[in-house]
């Protein structure tokens, strides 16, 4: 009986020939990522050793640039920690700054066939790179950094096979909203993606879909490796790796097919994304106060390109705030060079530095009482982006940009008729 990609990676990392659902695997961690939030507890100042500084990455993102004295102190602790243990991969405020999962992607820190851990729930973003990546709690991060180990219960796996190609104006976010609306939560399950249609998805699109696996309550989210992925990683990281492919006789809890060509733009209604997706026509015309594009899910260069395409030569509706946050400063620079930033600014958008910012309700776009926002980010539960009375709709960057122009939820289709998104 063969193994899934998740099972293969966990078996290899634990030194076992095989693992099966229900097993507990103690694995070697190839990469441990710490964020600024990791350094809020004072316990990190008391650590006596780091297992392997070359396997540790530190990124300041949730509270960056520091909006409070407490955040500034966390940054200071992180810098001291990096200096004390010789951790060279420190992404401080500056040109190397970014959201942790986006930095991991930009630098190809997540190697195919390996295990990566981070203290953030959206760590499964690295699954786009054929990496078994999971968010873990504070004690488990301490264990990973000091011993190089982590433990996971092996779950059952749901496999999605893609066919076809997305229509113009439909994106990976719409794939997620389709899966979340059709199949609901995947509690205690791994999600794996493959099939002939996968090749039509850009690396950035795969990143979006992998990131949103957290909102399905998935354990791991892993894409099959293909030539595009392997070339992307090798161009950015010289370290050797061994990607994991599923065995032909791998056992899945369920196997599902999705025809990408049949999908359309969707919107998740406020307060939840699971079992909560509707067609845009059902909410079109809903007035909004703010439109946001960013986060580890939708701060990619592809997302900024789509937003710029939609708003080019047009203006954001009066009374509507349109906030755009690139995932990393490197993405910001690339978007600036491509002309996307100028186009967004000309339309009336505000472009912020790379940060989790508005997505986590931290700063740079916090919602006030009773405000309505449409967001291309990670979450829309009550109070996520600010006041608990604010209502948050979730959609693709194209839908968000179209809505910013209208001052109300709008379908992006008219901006993509006759050419590619």
Residues of each region from the PLM?
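Fe-S-dependent hydro-lyases/dehydratases of central metabolism
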Residues: 1-421
């Amino acid at each position: 009986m063969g193994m899934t990609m998740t099972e293969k990676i966990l078996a290899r990392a634990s030194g076992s020939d095989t693992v099966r659902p229900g097993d507990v695997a103690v694995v070697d961690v190839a990469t441990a990522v710490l964020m600024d939030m990791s350094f809020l507890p004072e316990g990190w100042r008391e650590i006596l050793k780091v297992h392997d500084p070359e396997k540790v990455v530190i990124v300041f993102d949730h509270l960056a640039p520091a909006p409070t004295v407490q955040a500034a102190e966390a940054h200071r602790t992180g810098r001291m920690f990096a200096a004390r243990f010789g951790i060279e991969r420190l992404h401080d405020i500056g040109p190397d700054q970014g959201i942790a999962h986006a930095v991991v992607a930009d630098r190809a820190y997540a190697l195919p066939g390996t295990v990566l851990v981070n203290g953030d729930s959206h760590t499964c973003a690295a699954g786009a790179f054929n990496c078994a990546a999971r968010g873990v709690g504070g004690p488990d991060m301490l264990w990973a950094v000091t011993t190089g180990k982590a433990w996971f219960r092996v779950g059952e796996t749901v496999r999605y096979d893609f066919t076809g190609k997305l229509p113009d104006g439909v994106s990976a976010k719409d794939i997620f909203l389709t899966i979340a609306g059709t199949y609901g939560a995947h509690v205690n399950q791994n999600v794996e993606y493959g099939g002939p249609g996968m090749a039509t998805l850009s690396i950035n699109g795969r990143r979006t879909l992998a990131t949103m696996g957290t909102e399905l309550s998935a354990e791991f989210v892993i894409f099959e490796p293909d030539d595009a992925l392997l070339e992307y990683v090798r161009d950015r990281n010289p370290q050797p790796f061994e990607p994991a492919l599923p065995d032909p006789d791998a056992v899945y809890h369920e196997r599902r097919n999705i025809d990408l060509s049949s999908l359309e733009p969707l919107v998740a209604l406020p307060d939840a994304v699971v079992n909560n997706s509707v067609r845009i026509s059902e909410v079109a015309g809903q007035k909004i106060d703010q439109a946001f594009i960013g986060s580890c899910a939708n701060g990619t260069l592809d997302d900024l390109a789509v937003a710029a395409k939609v708003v080019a030569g047009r203006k954001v509706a009066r009374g509507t705030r349109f906030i755009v946050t690139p995932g990393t400063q490197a993405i910001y620079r690339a978007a600036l060079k491509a002309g996307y930033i100028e186009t967004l600014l000309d339309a009336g958008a505000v472009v912020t530095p790379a940060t989790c910012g508005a997505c986590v309700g931290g700063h740079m776009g916090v919602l006030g009482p009773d405000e309505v926002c449409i967001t291309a980010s990670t979450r829309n539960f009550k109070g996520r982006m600010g006041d608990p009375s604010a209502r948050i709709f979730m959609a693709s960057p194209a839908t968000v940009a179209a809505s910013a122009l209208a001052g109300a939820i709008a379908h992006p289709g008219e901006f993509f008729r006759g050419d590619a998104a």
